[in-house]
Amino acid sequence: MSINIGEISIPDLPIFFSMFLTIYLIAYFIVFRNWKPQIRPEASSCLISIFHGSPAVFLATRAVFSSSERSFASANTAAQNTVLDFSVAYFLTDLFHYIVFNPNDVLFIGHHVATLFVFLTCRFLVFHGACAILGLLILAEVTSACQNAWTLAGARKNDPESRLAVKVYDLLSPPFYAFYSIVRGVLGPLFFGKMVAFYARGGAHGVIPNWLWISWAIVVGIAITVSILWIWNLWIELFSERKANKIRVDKKIR
């Protein structure tokens, strides 16, 4: 799709990219200008994630369910392509953020490159499969708002001038971990399994090549595995910290 300005038709992707880049720069130079230099880039990344996550869930849900064809192999609709453009623009912006400020963070850079591969091939190579990709996007971003609030609080929890951040971080951690665990540890694998089974049975024969859906499956499978390991480690840290705090309290009482 494209946006018409007068007699000029501008593709969605450049407009969305300009939007996310502008939000990032405003966040870095204005919104978080008083934050420590070490955490300003991360906070700015969180802000563009906030502008992407929940809107992407809403737009993707609407794009999928407004279509009469909702097969994992059905042709992409114009609305679905717009959502793909929206997400590609976000991941491109965030990828540049990591390349500039965290070039050694190979895990996130690799994640963003792989995600862009999935979105771009669905959008511009085969023109099919958006229902599957957007379904995964919904599951990936439905936890975004909570995760970004938790991340922003975590970035400032060690700042003596921000006691509120510690309280927010401690308050959000258990429910966020539980929500994330259900979505990424249960719903995500179930949807992923359904998608792989569909393609393995030849459901997309003739429209999505085997090498491509297998590539998608590898990317998504690795992402789900890493997410599960990440949240598992956070649960371990949470229980370890609470156990240590309980021991300290018991010692004080004695």
From Swiss-Prot:
Keyword Transmembrane helix: yes
Membrane-protein topology: Multi-pass membrane protein
TLC domain sequence ranges: 38-248
Protein localization: Membrane
Keyword line: Membrane, Transmembrane, Transmembrane helix
InterPro entries (alphabetical): At5g14285-like (IPR040327), TLC-dom (IPR006634)
Domain of life: Eukaryota
Transmembrane parts of this sequence: 12-32, 45-65, 82-101, 124-144, 172-192, 211-231
Pfam name, any one: TRAM_LAG1_CLN8
A single Gene Ontology CC term: membrane
Name assigned to this protein: TLC domain-containing protein At5g14285
Organism whose genome encodes this protein: Arabidopsis thaliana
Taxon lineage: Eukaryota, Viridiplantae, Streptophyta, Embryophyta, Tracheophyta
